[in-house]
């Protein structure tokens, strides 16, 4: 009886307990894993899917991503919502980010000159071996953007402790194995996961060479399951196998190769997804970063998710099937995301110490003087960006990146990697005047650690030259130097609308100089010995012939150049001004036993923005010769599209292809109107007017020069491509000209 009473009492207590504690309260909801696949620019569709998931109030407990999916997923994991990522996606200059370009206003004078001549720079290692790059793009711009977007997450012990636990996938080229990032630098993990082989340089990490995770696991469903996900929502950006006619670009070929490599795992992971979303992205590729394409792909991602709305609602019901009402009400996705911390892109924050890694103590002292940031101070994200741009613009580092500690005040570390001691630079161009031209240079002009700087430059063309230059001093300060240049000139000379002859001569120039670059200014002065050996007759402006077979001169020169253009070709703002004076002698004091003769040069031009497509491009140039006796070689020559191509003092006259002999005093003006038709395609109309006179005092009443040209151009990565038609009073005939490549 006592035993029966004890059992009865126990049953009563048991029932009372569960009467006040529902069984479902003991069961949490199911955990949701979001898997974001790779696909380059097509990742915009993932942003559209995120918008619908937020609208449907689908909770996200784990995120696993590959390539662009790692970027979208990584940002979502630290607090950015779909609207934030949408804005980031639309407002980026993707052409700049997916390159190693440096904004021209951040570059030094020397860097501007070299970048606007050469197509490729190949480092030479200390062992004098050619060191080819491991990828077309090092990815510094995109990495520094990731670092900016992930402040506070540069050194993470465990990605499981992020606001939303996160993993991303890369592939180790050394062992051919998949690497899943679960800790460390979040921006570095994102950058490694998107290192498309051959396009982006691999990321070196713990002895591994990491490339795009899509090569082995482009849809990491298995990774999300290992994290603990019960339910998998998968966004797949693939568009199936491309047909032969669709493989027309490098990006489409690389995309197809990556898809082929991970097919077995891809199919298995796709089959294990509880909800599979595959936006319709036919016609778009990993390189479709145009604003119109991004807008369309975001919409298509949203449409694809909305088409699954009923399945989303059923899935949400399944996720909460075993959970009580309080769990459901406390788990609203929108409320949870509002509570997530998110790095600010505009607010200033405090930094603590500043360290610089990768350079010597002497170099560090100089760099600290250059940067405007100070320890234990407040800085803005824009100031960090400006410092990075300045360091990259110096052109002496192959790597400029940074990291910060995770808590404010953030300790700031700049990670620098000096360039190789030497490099080979190569450029090429084609035009209808000289056909093909090639230029090559071997230099150490990108080495800050030495005070000895040299450059050997050669051009192969109808007018070839060889130049050797040595300078001693601070690379970005004052330098003294010497140079030698041997050049062969061969071009047709015209005067008064008629061809005089084909000029041909050889020149040797030896110079000693002082130069200093100060911001956008370059100061230069020196003395130069010129020797000319003529293989043809030299003509005076009146048609008379100079009978000498050679000439020699000892000249003194000084010049100031200011350049604030944002771009050398197709500038949208800024200006360029040059002022130069030269005194010519043949013995250091006299010329032809009389007084020396001199020249004064002024050139000024600018770009004026009228609206987003129209630009006004005025130019003014003049060259005045003073003295009773001026030899034929130093007279005024005009013609062609570039100053100094046929002779160092030849002035461009873009409405005439041939070189024309002018009077001793010349003033020319040009007014151009440039219209950007679409993207990188431009149309330009320009008019030219000038005056020439024997005497300086007669310049205003001198002979008229006029002309005009219409030009269609495309801003190609290997140099501008253009075709133009022109007419000038110098030739009185319609001319046509085609150019492809940088001018040099």
Regions found by a protein language model. Name each.
Residues 1-29:
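Bacterial Sec-dependent N-terminal signal peptides
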Residues 526, 617-621, 684-686:
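Outer-envelope exported proteins of Gram-negative bacteria
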Residues 672-705:
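C-terminal hydrophobic structural anchor segments
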Residues 423-428, 556-561, 565-678:
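C-terminal outer-membrane beta-barrel translocator/porin domains of Gram-negative envelope proteins
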Residues 25-66, 74-382, 386-389, 393-401, ...:
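Patatin-like phospholipase
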Residues 485-489, 530-532, 579-588, 623-625, ...:
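Short glycine-rich beta-strand segments
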Residues 381-387, 393-565, 569, 638-652, ...:
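Gram-negative/organellar outer-membrane beta-barrel architecture
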């Amino acid at each position: 009886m006592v035993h029966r009473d004890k059992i009865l009492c126990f049953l009563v207590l048991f029932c009372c307990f569960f009467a006040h504690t529902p069984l479902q309260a003991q069961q949490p909801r199911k955990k949701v894993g979001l898997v974001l696949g790779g696909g380059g620019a097509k990742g915009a569709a993932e942003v559209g899917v995120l918008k619908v998931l937020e609208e449907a109030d689908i909770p996200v407990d784990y995120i696993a991503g590959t390539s662009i999916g790692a970027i979208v997923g990584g940002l979502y994991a630290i607090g950015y919502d779909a609207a934030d990522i949408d804005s980031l996606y639309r407002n980026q200059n993707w052409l700049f980010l997916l390159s190693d370009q440096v904004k021209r206003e951040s570059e030094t004078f020397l860097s501007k000159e070299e970048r606007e001549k050469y197509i490729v720079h190949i480092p030479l290692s200390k062992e004098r071996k050619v060191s080819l790059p491991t990828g077309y793009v090092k990815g510094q711009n995109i990495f520094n953007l990731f670092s900016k977007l992930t402040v506070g997450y540069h050194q993470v012990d465990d990605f499981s402790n992020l606001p939303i636990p996160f993993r991303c996938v890369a592939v180790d080229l050394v062992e051919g194995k998949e690497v899943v990032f679960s800790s460390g630098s979040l921006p570095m993990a994102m950058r490694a996961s998107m290192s498309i082989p051959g396009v982006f340089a691999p990321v070196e990490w713990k002895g591994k060479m990491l490339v795009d995770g899509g090569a082995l696991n482009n849809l990491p469903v298995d990774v999300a399951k290992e994290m603990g996900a019960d339910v998998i929502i998968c966004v797949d950006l693939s568009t199936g196998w491309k047909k032969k006619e669709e493989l027309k670009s490098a990006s489409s070929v690389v995309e197809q190769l990556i898809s082929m490599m991970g097919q077995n795992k891809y199919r298995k992971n796709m089959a294990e997804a509880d909800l599979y979303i595959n936006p319709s992205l036919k016609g778009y590729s990993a390189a479709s970063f145009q604003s119109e394409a991004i807008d369309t792909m975001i919409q298509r991602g949203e449409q694809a998710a909305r088409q699954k709305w009923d399945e989303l609602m059923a899935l949400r019901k399944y996720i909460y099937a075993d959970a009580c009402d309080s769990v459901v009400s406390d788990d609203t996705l929108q409320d949870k995301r509002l509570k997530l911390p998110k790095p600010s892109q505009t607010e200033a924050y405090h930094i603590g110490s500043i360290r610089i890694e990768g350079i010597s103590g002497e170099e560090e002292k100089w760099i600290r003087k250059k940067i405007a940031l100070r320890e234990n101070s407040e800085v803005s994200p824009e100031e960090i960006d400006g410092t990075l741009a300045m360091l990259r613009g110096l052109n002496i580092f192959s790597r400029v990146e940074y990291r910060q500690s995770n808590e404010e005040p953030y300790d700031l570390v700049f990670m620098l990697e000096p360039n190789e001691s030497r490099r080979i630079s190569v450029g090429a161009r084609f035009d209808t005047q000289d056909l093909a031209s090639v230029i090559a240079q071997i230099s150490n002009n990108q080495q800050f650690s030495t005070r000895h700087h040299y450059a050997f430059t050669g051009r192969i063309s109808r007018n070839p030259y060889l130049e050797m230059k040595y300078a001693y001093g601070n690379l970005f300060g004052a330098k003294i130097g010497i140079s030698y240049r041997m050049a062969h000139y061969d071009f047709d000379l015209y005067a008064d609308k008629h061809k005089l002859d084909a000029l041909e001569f050889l020149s040797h120039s030896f110079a000693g100089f002082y130069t200093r670059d100060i911001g956008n200014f370059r100061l230069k002065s020196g003395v130069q010995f010129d020797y000319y050996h003529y293989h043809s007759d030299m003509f005076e402006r009146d048609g008379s012939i100079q009978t000498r077979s050679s000439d020699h001169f000892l000249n003194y020169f000084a010049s100031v150049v200011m350049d604030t253009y944002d771009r050398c070709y197709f500038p949208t703002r800024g200006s360029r001004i040059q002022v130069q004076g030269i005194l010519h002698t043949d013995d250091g004091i006299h010329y032809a036993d009389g007084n020396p003769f001199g020249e004064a040069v002024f050139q000024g031009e600018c770009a004026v923005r009228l609206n987003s497509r129209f630009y006004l491009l005025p130019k003014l140039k003049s060259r005045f010769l003073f003295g009773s006796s001026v030899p034929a070689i130093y007279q005024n020559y005009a013609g062609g599209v570039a100053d100094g191509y046929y002779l160092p003092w030849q002035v461009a006259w873009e409405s005439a292809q041939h070189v024309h002999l002018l009077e001793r005093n010349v003033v020319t003006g040009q007014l151009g109107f440039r219209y950007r038709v679409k993207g990188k395609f431009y149309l330009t109309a320009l008019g030219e007017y000038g005056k020439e006179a024997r005497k300086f005092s007669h310049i205003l009443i001198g002979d008229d020069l006029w002309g005009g040209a219409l030009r269609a151009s495309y801003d190609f990565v290997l140099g501008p491509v253009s075709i133009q038609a022109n007419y000038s009073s110098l030739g009185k005939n319609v001319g046509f000209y085609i150019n492809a490549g940088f001018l040099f």
